[in-house]
């Protein structure tokens, strides 16, 4: 038996929530599954979190979301007597009356007390769970209280506010104790504030990020670097933190490192190195920024990066598939002129019309489409107006000579 739960559960919580190690997290899954199959309800609950999506653990753990498995595992955890499973089900809206009836606890308070006692005993994961029952006000359901239990609506509101703020000491203990994940809701509460509960306090939010960075949590190193990058004289410190985070597997940090090499403000400009950083970031297929910036370097093909329109199209399409239009002017230009892809004026027009920005490439592309009637009825006047919007752009100036 482990310190707080079974060995399999304690070891899994350690690997998944107290470290940022993909291999350790992956290795914890099979022992969890074996324990769950043997009737360990807590193991089933931790497994359910693994397949619930990145919002339930570190973004870069090697888990795949599976909604069907989540429901099955949550149900299994409750039936097998997991108090964590009960609180987790309540938090994600899965604690139906049927599920509540199936739990081997007299009431929700009894289940809450089990987790609370483990939090009191020092379990960081349990501390975070108790903090969340206050933060999300699940404690209202646990306590079984409502407006009619108070002398006035105002008194009920005061109780709600006081209850929500009780989350902070629990989050603070878990975060400082080694659970980087526990800082998320605490940070959001200070950074964004909540009307009627707490005013935004950016300095406290920054302090949380700084503490996380000092403790070596890669996601918090990245977040704190975001505070430092705009502060005078601290850009190099920010870049060092991005490097530290990236080396621990925080793939999103490669975007900021690549951007630093591409822009050459903090370090000497080195676009080939920037390209390498973006490609490292693209180990995460959802890395929109890296896809766009890599596409930009390949589209222009300068500063040491060979021009490669076909790869540029691939990267821009990857970003566009996630509803991002940052590179639409370049992607549309590729489709308009057949750079690295088949010519497709209709697709180019669609891409140009999706954006809310204005660039020379965009205006030149629209000017070309309208003056040549490509994919749209020819409209010389409209096309010329687009050419005229271009600023110091030789292709547009050359095109205008045809319409004097």
Task: Label each residue range with its predicted role.
Residues 14-15, 46-58, 88-98, 129-141, ...:
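Hydrophobic face of amphipathic alpha-helices that form TPR/SEL1-like repeat modules
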Residues 4, 38-41, 54-55, 59-60, ...:
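Short helix-capping/linker turns of helical repeat alpha-solenoids
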Residues 71, 75-78, 378-395:
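TPR/TPR-like (Sel1-like) alpha-helical repeat modules
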Residues 32-35, 77, 118, 174, ...:
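Alpha-helical solenoid scaffolds that mediate protein-protein interactions
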Residues 1-27, 42:
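N-terminal leader/linker segments that initiate helical-solenoid repeat arrays
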Residues 16-24, 53-67, 95-107, 136-164, ...:
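Short coil/turn connectors between adjacent alpha-helices in alpha-solenoid helical repeat scaffolds
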């Amino acid at each position: 038996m482990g310190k707080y739960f079974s060995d399999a559960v304690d070891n899994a919580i350690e690997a998944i929530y107290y470290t940022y190690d993909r291999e350790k997290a992956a290795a914890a899954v099979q022992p969890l599954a074996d324990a769950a199959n043997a009737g360990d309800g807590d193991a089933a609950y931790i497994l359910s979190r693994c397949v619930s999506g990145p919002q339930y653990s570190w973004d870069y753990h090697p888990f795949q979301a599976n909604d069907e498995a989540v429901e099955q595992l949550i149900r299994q955890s409750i039936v097998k007597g997991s108090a964590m499973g009960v609180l987790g089900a309540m938090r994600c809206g899965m604690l139906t009356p049927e599920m509540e009836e199936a739990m081997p606890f007299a009431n929700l308070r009894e289940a809450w007390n089990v987790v609370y006692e483990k939090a009191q005993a020092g379990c960081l994961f349990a501390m975070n769970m108790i903090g969340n029952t206050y933060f999300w006000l699940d404690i209202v359901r646990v306590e079984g209280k409502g407006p009619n239990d108070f002398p006035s609506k105002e008194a009920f509101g005061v109780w709600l506010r006081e209850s929500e703020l009780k989350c902070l000491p629990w989050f603070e203990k878990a975060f400082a104790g080694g659970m980087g994940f526990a800082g998320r809701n605490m940070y959001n509460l200070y950074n964004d504030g909540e009307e009627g509960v707490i005013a935004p306090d950016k300095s406290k939010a920054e302090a949380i990020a700084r503490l996380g960075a000092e403790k070596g949590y890669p996601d918090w190193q990245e977040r704190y670097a975001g505070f430092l990058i705009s502060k005078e004289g601290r850009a190099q410190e920010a870049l060092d933190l991005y490097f530290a985070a990236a080396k621990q597997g925080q793939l999103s940090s490669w975007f900021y490192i690549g951007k630093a090499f591409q822009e050459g403000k903090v370090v000497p400009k080195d676009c080939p190195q920037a390209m390498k950083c973006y490609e490292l970031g693209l180990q995460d297929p959802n890395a929109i920024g890296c896809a766009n910036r890599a596409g930009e370097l390949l589209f222009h093909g300068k500063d040491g990066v060979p021009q490669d329109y076909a790869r540029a199209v691939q990267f821009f399409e990857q970003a566009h598939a996630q509803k991002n239009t940052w590179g639409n002017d370049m992607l549309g230009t590729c489709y308009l002129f057949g750079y690295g892809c088949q010519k497709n004026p209709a697709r180019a027009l669609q891409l140009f019309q999706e954006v809310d920005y204005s660039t020379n490439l965009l205006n030149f592309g629209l000017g070309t489409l309208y003056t040549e009637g490509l994919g749209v009825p020819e409209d010389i006047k409209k096309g010329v107006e687009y050419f005229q919007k271009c600023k110091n752009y030789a292709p547009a100036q050359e095109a205008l000579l045809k319409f004097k």
